[in-house]
Amino acid sequence: MGAPGRVLLWLQLCALTRAAYKLWVPNTYFDAADNWSQNQTPCAGAAVKFPADKMVSVLVREGHSISDMEELQDRKRENIHSFIHCSFIDRASPPASPFRCPAARTGALLPVQSLQCTCILAHRPLLPLDGEFVLASGAGFSAQNTGSHLDCSAGASALFLDPDRFLWHDPRLWSAGDAGRSLFSVDAERVPCRHDDAVFPSDASFRVGLGPGTVRVRSVRALGQTFTRDEDLAAFLASRAGRLRFHGSGALSVDPEACADPSGCVCGNAEVQPWICAALLQPLGGRCPQAACQDALRPEGQCCDLCGAIVSLTHGPAFDLERYRARLLHAFLALPQYQGLRMAMSKVPRQPHLHEASGAKADTEIQVVLAETGPETGSAGRLARALLADIAEHGEALGVLSATARESGPPVGGSSAAGLNAPGARSDLMGGLVAALLLLLLVLLVAALLLRRAGRLRWSRRHEAASEPAGTPLGFRNPVFYTADSVDPPPAPQPDVRSSSRSYFINPLYGEAEAEAEA
């Protein structure tokens, strides 16, 4: 059975035992274009450079024609016409002593046997500080003069990128076994969790940087070996093969205990989530991109906000996580109206609410994240409400005790018009406009009444003004200041000597009556 078959068998066994696994994706292949500068493999006749202060194992699958191999920090070129030690790694027929390769001539392949072999430089490393070529069957190098190929200019060199750039805590470098079109994992769970199996491709070259702290997983599979005990794993990491593939200040340990709870187990990456988010956001300058919706949500274990909905479930002993996930996939996400959604489901620590006493409820819950991937919004909220209705009807049979839902707001920017096309959005808009108009009319009416009462606002009666004669003067006759030409002013009254007042006036309205009485 070949290496791909063994990996497939291992993954099937993991699935049968309900154990999740994460598969390491990047490699350090010589033939992989993304391991070289300018995203292309060395062309024929090119000079090849490796970082001088790094350790790496490089798998070579094909034949290559190159001119020189150089160290970055040593400008003296090491010509490919050098002696190489080639030690066979096939234990079935190991050689008595390291095989001595003769100097290669121009145009001639370095000796490559039918067995896979690891080539190490005899005196000065062509590779950096400590490294190796792993030559597959039929692979090798041939020497060719610089510039003999049209694609290679004189003095052009191909740079092998830093192999230490691959970090364990980078979620982009792992592939989950249960990943699908409608499924995803929150960022903290994209890295191997406490009860996961970390699987590295067999018979392949790779390089993994262990970050700070201790990484603990259920098992580690590398180079065709499965490590479930710390003693065996520590011996491998201390070996030359282990040092070439694992580096860093962190520690790696295993615990073969599997997750036996049908409702799932907490991932256990909460402590290393800051490093996970730092590695994930490093290409973006350490900042999250702006979400495409208002009131975006950030699920437990996610580094950045997203648009969609979150359904939180509390469960009883009858709840089965895998069975409920399958139910949602087939009964809901398979429907046409939910095709643009992706779902993540896992057990997470439960954050108690402010009005709850500590320890009043379970300390874990099931988090169902419904993420919207398309420009249209609202489908995640509709699915969340459908799940609540389904739980209200079948919750007891499913083992769900209670459920709550949260959903993000409408889109931001130019995409907000899409949300206004929904019937509910249009009715809300019309209701808001009517309420605003009524409020405006009420404010105007109150302002007019206040101004009228204060005397700052008057209006004339046009029908009364029209009925008055043309010659009638406007206003009223003030007897104090008004004097008519045809009426003589009344005589001034004589002051009463008995009065102690020194100044007084007579009211013109009553002055005539008093004068007649005195007469």
Curated annotation (Swiss-Prot):
It is a single-pass type I membrane protein. Keywords: Cell membrane, Coated pit, Disulfide bond, Endosome, Glycoprotein, Membrane, Protein transport, Signal, Transmembrane, Transmembrane helix, Transport. InterPro entries: AMN. Detected in kidney cortex (at protein level). Glycans are attached at residues 35, 39. Residues 1-19 form the signal peptide. N-glycosylated. A soluble form arises by proteolytic removal of the membrane anchor. One of its GO terms (cellular component) is endocytic vesicle. Residues 67-143 are annotated as: Interaction with CUBN. It is found in: Apical cell membrane; Cell membrane; Endosome membrane; Membrane, Coated pit. Residues 20-430 are extracellular. Residues 256-308 form the VWFC domain. Disulfide bonds join 43-152, 193-267, 259-265, 277-303, 288-304, 293-307. One of its GO terms (biological process) is protein transport. Residues 452-519 are cytoplasmic. The chain crosses the membrane at residues 431-451. The keyword Protein transport applies. Interacts (via extracellular region) with CUBN/cubilin, giving rise to a huge complex containing one AMN chain and three CUBN chains. The complex formed by AMN and CUBN is composed of a 400 Angstrom long stem and a globular crown region. The stem region is probably formed by AMN and the CUBN N-terminal region, including the EGF-like domains. The crown is probably formed by the CUBN CUB domains. Membrane-bound component of the endocytic receptor formed by AMN and CUBN. Required for normal CUBN glycosylation and trafficking to the cell surface. The complex formed by AMN and CUBN is required for efficient absorption of vitamin B12. Required for normal CUBN-mediated protein transport in the kidney. This is Protein amnionless.
